[in-house]
Amino acid sequence: MAAEDRVRWDEIYRTFARQPYPAPDPFLLEHTPIITTDTEYYALDLAGGMGQNGLWLAEQGYITDVMDISRVALYRARVEMTVRNLRNVNLLQVDIDTLDLHPYHYDIVCVFRYLRRDTLPAIRQAVKPGGRVIYESYNLEYLTHVPEFNTRFLLQHNELLDNFQGWEVVAHEEDEHITRLTAIRPEESESVVKARQEQYEQARQKADANTPEVEHKDDTFEW
């Protein structure tokens, strides 16, 4: 499925080749904290496409990972990075269906126009205590505009709220066919954070040890 998805999304993004580079999403601009210290802050633009949101975060001072399955989209992001002389962006071609994110790594995780429910636990764990998720995607009302759209990729009523229970909700909107959420992860003690990070590393090492070596051909890619 990953190979088919790569081909499909590459073809989609080729249709945008001659169009102007898109602007970042207004909801992201509204809910991104301003960096006021010399501390390093990290952001993830998940399923980021051509990177318009991730590059904007980088311009605000965040060290940003842009992850997408499409090499064509990431190439467009790379060109724009060069134009803007941005050096604090990592462009990562990944199969998001098998997403594996380090816990407590990002100050911001943003997701726009993308929904895979099995990625939500990884998104939650990747946000630092005090960090935030900024999420915007289509909900079931989108069927009134595109009746043939696959309902697997549409949010149910209050679904994002349910998935981020216990987080501080800064904003939640269900506006026509779009649902938006900004939520802040609760603070946790250093001992809890350290214990969970160690559990993650142990589980990952065990999984790596039990995975047979295979030859990879262009499965992942990093600029």
At which residue positions do the language-model features occur?
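Conserved SAM/SAH-binding beta-strand->alpha-helix loop
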Residues: 70-72
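Conserved SAM-binding loop
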Residues: 77-78
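Conserved class I S-adenosyl-L-methionine
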Residues: 40-49
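A short acidic, Gly/Pro-enriched loop at the edge of an enzyme's catalytic core
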Residues: 99-108
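Conserved SAM-binding strand-loop segment of SAM-dependent methyltransferases
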Residues: 85-96
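Core SAM-dependent methyltransferase catalytic element
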Residues: 174-223
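Conserved beta-strand signature within the Rossmann-like core of class I S-adenosyl-L-methionine
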Residues: 131-141
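S-adenosyl-L-methionine
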Residues: 1-38
